[in-house]
Structure formats: structure tokens, C-alpha cells
Amino acid sequence: MSDLNALTIADARDALRKGEVTSVDLTQACLSAIDQADALGTFVHKTPDLALERAKAADARIAEGDAPDMCGIPVGIKDLFCTEGVPSQAASRILDGFKPEYESTVSGKLRDAGAVMLGKLNMDEFAMGSSNETSVYGNAVNPWRAGNSDAALTPGGSSGGSASAVAGDLCLAATGTDTGGSIRQPAAFTGIVGLKPTYGRCSRWGIVAFASSLDQAGPMTKTVRDAAIMGRAMMGYDAKDSTSANIDVPDFEAMLTGDIRGKIIGIPKEYRMDGMPDEIETLWADGTAMLKDAGAVIRDISLPHTKYALPAYYVIAPAEASSNLARYDGVRFGYRADMAPGDGITEMYEKTRAEGFGPEVQRRVMIGTYVLSAGFYDAYYNRARRVRALIKRDFDEVFAAGVDAILTPATPSAAFELGKEVSDPVEMYLNDVFTVTVNLAGLPGVAVPTGVDRNGLPLGLQLIGKPWEEGELLNTAYALEAAAGFVAKPARWW
């Protein structure tokens, strides 16, 4: 078999079971691809020896029979996940040198299922960003190029390294996290599938926290079937996470029939934004037609508080971040600034945090501290919480009225050039306009590649589902994927 690193999880699993390939073969193919792809800036901590050790163990387990679906599958792990004995820095200087003595629950579940970790993946610092330009390691780069241009494009963020690695066939799949769109937006920018599960489906234990009421881990894969396979392995109850849901995780793959006849798909009028590119409008209309042709019933719906989602999100998320990031003080772990003679503990805190956090993280911490301050708590934070409740109620009412899933664009544009929006925070924040509502409401959402723009760049649509019904959501995504027939791959330039 050639190009083993280009296989899907499902195809690799089947080949492993038939003895047509070994996990060591798959792992070596990925490690070779990684070594040739430094220009993509994806893997920031490579673990080849550990990967081959785990691959050999996976092969032995497969030979014994009855191995889990993920056994022997080479994957990348976002740098936000704590991985035992392997640097886990959240792409920040302030965690320089931090090697956890424990494994996050999600990466531990994958390890226990026999998945092979190839290394840690680039991301925006502390998951704060939409372009992977805030990382201490430097930019991750999209493997796609626009037309004949050789301009470097963003892979999206914050899970930009994960998206680029999967799209560039450096690994078969990767973990991501999604606080306001950080799985779905990069997936759409790179032509892959990204699933953000219901809040509470994946344990947050051992994942460096950004905004605790919004953060959720999920799979980033080449196909919807792969998302079903990997998602199931990542999900499940964890007593160490107080927000983890003790709800059974079904066999999502077994639910992929592609039959959506009679399913009601909602099209929210509020997602038609002023100035939205014609290509996005056309993509959305085409996706709607595809689902209708597959037997779904299309219904226009209203989510009236959508316009308040972005402002509410950019109050709540920074507020939680300012609280979560208060622990980084240079005392117990990570980076500590050099002290001048006479400096005390206050100076150490100030210098360490000023030098350890990048500009975007500092910006959000300051915003969060401001909105939580005594004089502004009610005016900003409490008001944003009330708006969040209204947004959730909008979705609850739509689903209660019989809608099975909601179809929207995943992003307001295709991938843009690195450096283009980094100087304008508001412009950058607008990249999350279609995705933040899902986090605020705690719902599952999935980005599916469905077309390309005039420059040949991938475009994705988002499906939003009912809470805890990832299986139904993935089946609808499976039908959309089949109808769209997206098979484009980036031309290799790296």
C-alpha cells in the first residue's frame, strides 16, 4: 500500500485487522511525512521513539484479536492536552519546559485504546486566536494555496496545527479543542471534518483551561466516519471533571446510514450576514439543496438573539480566561522572569506574566479582569450571562418545534493570508461569528467540507445538533458529505 499516511482511520483500521499493514508501517509513514513538512509548522514536539514503541504494542494487541477501533492509528495531539512526560505548553512561553506527570483524560482514552501519539501540535497560545498566529512556536501554515499564489495562508485557529497536520496527511487524525469555533473553523479552512461534541461529552481534565464553561475537546479527521470512530474513543464520563456527563456513548459509526428522509433541517435567517461573500451564500444554498435531495425537509427558522452572541462570547470567555490564567505566576512551574536586585514577589509576578504571556492573551486577560471588576460586573458579565441564556433558549425552542439539525456556514470566508487580520482584533474575532452560538448553548456542531472557492480553497458548512445526539448529527453530516463529494486535496508545495 502506498501513501499510508493518507489513509483514513476506517481504511487503516480495516487494513490493520486484515494484516495488510502494521501500525509500525503506518507510524513510520507519518513520521517520514512529518520530517518533510517543517514548512507547515504543525508538530512542535515530536515523539518518534514513543510513537514506534506504542505502534509495536498496538501491533501485538491487534495480533491477539479484539483490539479497539483506534488501536494502531497514528494521531497528533494538540499542545493544550497534558501528556505525561511530554512537553505540554499550550503554545505559551509561560509554560516553557512544563512536562506533566499525568495524562489528560481524553489523550489517555486514546492511548488506552491503542492510538499512537506522533507528537504535540501547534495552536494559538492558550487556544486564544483564530489564525494560529499567537503561538510561541511561530505560525502553523495551511497546506492549501490560493490558485497560483504562493502566499502562506492561515489554517485557522486555535487548532491550526491539528487541522494542517490532518489536511497535509502528516497524521491520520488529531485532537482539537473548541471554545468558540476552534475545531470547526480550522476544519473548514483546511477541507477536513471537525466535530465539537456536546459540552460535557469529553472530559476537560488535563486540558489547559481557557474558558471552562465553553471548552470542549473533539476529533479532527479526514471523513465523517473517522470523526464517529475517534469521537467515540474520546468521549465518556470522568469523575475527575465535575462537568462531565454520565451518559452512555453510543456506537456512532453504526448510526451512519446516510438516511435522512423526513429529517427537518432548520435554516436560520439571522445567519445571513451583511457583506457575506456570494461564494458562502451559494455554498449554503447548495448544501441546503443537497440535504433536500437526500429526503430532508427544509424549514426556515429564527434564532433571534444570534446578533448578540459574539459580544456576549467576548465578555464571558475573557472573564473565565482571566480567572483561569491567574495561576500562572512563575512560582511552581513554567517560565520565571529574571529578577533585578531588590525585586520582591510582586515584581516577579508582574515581570513573569508580562514576559510569559503574548499580546493576545494579555489583551483577553485585561478585558476579562475589567468586565469582572466591581464597577462593571453587572453591566458586562451578568448581562452577557443573561444573553447566553437567551441564545440557548432560542435553540431549545427550535429543537422543541421539531427541527432535527440546523445548517449554517462554518466560516464567513475561505482561509486568509497570514498577517492579514492579526493587527485588527475585531476583524479576527468575526471569524467566529457562525460558531460561538454553539459553544454558548453547549450544543454539538460539526464542520463538513462541501466545496471550493474561486481560488480552489476549501469551504465548509456547519451542522448543529440537539444535545447528546452526536450520532444523529454525524449521520446528517454523513449524508451531506456523500452528496457534496468533496475529494480535493492540497497540491504539495512543502
Swiss-Prot record:
Q: Name one GO biological process term.
A: translation
Q: Name one Pfam family in it.
A: Amidase
The chemistry this enzyme catalyses reads:
L-glutamyl-tRNA(Gln) + L-glutamine + ATP + H2O = L-glutaminyl-tRNA(Gln) + L-glutamate + ADP + phosphate + H(+)
Q: What SUPFAM superfamilies does the record tag this protein with?
A: Amidase signature (AS) enzymes
Its keywords, alphabetically, are: ATP-binding, Ligase, Nucleotide-binding, Protein biosynthesis
Under Enzyme Commission nomenclature, its number is 6.3.5.7
Give the main EC class.
ligase
Coiled coil feature spans: none
Which superkingdom? Bacteria
Of the GO CC terms on this record, one is: glutamyl-tRNA(Gln) amidotransferase complex
Q: Which residues form the active site?
A: 78, 158, 182
Q: Which GO terms describe its molecular function?
A: ATP binding; glutaminyl-tRNA synthase (glutamine-hydrolyzing) activity
Q: Which family does it belong to?
A: Belongs to the amidase family. GatA subfamily.
Q: What does this protein do?
A: Allows the formation of correctly charged Gln-tRNA(Gln) through the transamidation of misacylated Glu-tRNA(Gln) in organisms which lack glutaminyl-tRNA synthetase. The reaction takes place in the presence of glutamine and ATP through an activated gamma-phospho-Glu-tRNA(Gln).
Q: How does it assemble?
A: Heterotrimer of A, B and C subunits.
What's the protein here called?
Glutamyl-tRNA(Gln) amidotransferase subunit A
Q: Which organism is it from?
A: Jannaschia sp. (strain CCS1)
Instruction: Identify the taxonomic lineage of the organism of origin.
Output: Bacteria, Pseudomonadati, Pseudomonadota, Alphaproteobacteria, Rhodobacterales
Name of encoding gene: gatA
